[in-house]
A protein has these predicted regions:
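Conserved donor NDP-sugar-binding/catalytic core segment of glycosyltransferases
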Residues: 97-129
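Cell-envelope/extracellular polymer assembly enzymes that use nucleotide-activated donors
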Residues: 3-6, 34, 184
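Short aromatic/hydrophobic "clamp" motif used to bind/position activated sugar donors
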Residues: 85
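N-proximal low-complexity "stem/linker" segments adjacent to membrane-targeting elements
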Residues: 1-27
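Glycine-rich, basic loop-to-helix element that forms the pyrophosphate-binding segment
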Residues: 64-80, 101, 155-159
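A recurrent flexible, glycine/aromatic-enriched loop bordering the glycosyltransferase active site
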Residues: 120, 141-162, 166, 175-180, ...
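The conserved acidic donor/metal-binding loop of glycosyltransferases
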Residues: 89-93
């Protein structure tokens, strides 16, 4: 049976953030997904963090020379088994029930690509919330990062993006550019 979801997490020098992300994945109620962590030439590797979750998650850790986020995402997708690949930045923390909500929505309305808003964690200080707002405001992101559920046109953002594997392959993956590498998905 094919895995339904593969989480792809490129990481560069963020072991603490990866720990928080993996912890959030252990709290998902939908099981049977895999996690592909791609270490992109870090000086602060997260191998030990990944090993800590090996009994709770189907996790695969890869260490490779630095090539940037796009190429690291492609590297992870090449090794993934999922029908859908969900690309997450290493500092993402998923809410409990994230994957159940994704599965429910895909059952209700099948889609080739999906994404989600980001929001400040309730524990953030006022300064952290202000920074988060400035980065997720409707005025700077077209609404999706500020919590709006629907847009007239969907522009997935690679920090929290799911895409059907066959569509990803048709697009040829991410560009090798170091910034703006997700432009082909817009």
């Amino acid at each position: 049976m094919m895995t339904r979801f593969s989480f792809i997490v490129p990481v560069f020098n963020r072991p603490d953030e990866v720990d928080e992300l993996l912890q959030s994945l252990t709290r998902q109620t939908v099981r049977g997904f895999e996690v592909i962590v791609v270490e992109d030439g870090s000086q602060m590797p997260c191998r030990d963090v990944c090993e800590k979750y090996a009994s709770q998650l189907d996790i695969h850790y890869f260490d490779k020379p630095n090539s940037g986020p796009g190429q690291s995402r492609n590297y992870g997708v090449e090794r993934a088994q999922g029908e859908y690949v969900i690309i997450l930045d290493s500092d993402v923390v998923l809410p409990d029930g994230y994957l159940a909500a994704v599965e429910q929505e895909l059952q209700r309305e099948p889609a080739d690509a999906f994404g989600g808003p980001d929001s400040a964690h309730p524990s953030f200080t006022p300064t952290q919330k202000a920074i988060s707002y400035s980065m997720t405001s409707f005025f700077t992101t077209g609404g999706i990062r500020g919590g709006k559920k629907k847009l007239d046109k969907f522009y997935p953002r690679s920090f929290n993006m799911g895409i059907r594997r066959e569509v990803y392959e048709q697009l040829g993956g991410f560009s090798s550019m170091r910034f703006g590498e997700d432009i082909d998905f817009s």
